[in-house]
Amino acid sequence: LFPPALGPISQPFDLKESHFAVDIVVKENTPIKAIADGTVIFSEWTAETGYVIILEHSSGILSVYKHNASLTKKQGDSVLSGEVIATAGNTGELSTGFHLHFELWMDGYPMNPENFFNFSEE
């Protein structure tokens, strides 16, 4: 698996608070990368979370990337692990600064991305 972006975590995964993601602080237009080979199943603008892209991977895994400045792939595209799929931004009503809101789902259940990735820049 390939980390989508590197940077400090501003808000961790928290089931009790229904924050099914990690928020990774990044600079504007940081390349956002696919965590694994997959297919784009959603690539659109949403009012609350800005430009969103969702990838479907093997073994029932979905990866979700929100608040992007732009998307470089469209629905139906195949992507490779580490391929740039978006640029980081601060889009959508719920964004509080430049960051990547990154979700990982397995068989319909949210997973803590920090159990699978090291987001540290060191």
Enumerate the language-model features and the residues they cover.
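Conserved, short, structured surface segments that act as functional micro-motifs
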Residues: 77-122
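Residue-level recognition of beta-strand microenvironments
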Residues: 12, 43-44, 71, 88-91, ...
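Short, acidic/hydrophobic/Gly-rich beta-strand patch recurrent on exposed beta strands
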Residues: 22-25, 52-57, 101-103
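Short, well-structured beta-strand-loop connectors
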Residues: 31-40, 73-88
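Short acidic/polar mixed-charge low-complexity motifs
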Residues: 30, 59-62, 109
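Surface-exposed, glycine-biased beta-strand/turn segments
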Residues: 1-49
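Zn2+-dependent peptidoglycan hydrolase active-site motif and core
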Residues: 35-72, 98
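Conserved beta-strand positions that form and line the central face of beta-propeller blades
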Residues: 23, 54, 64, 87, ...
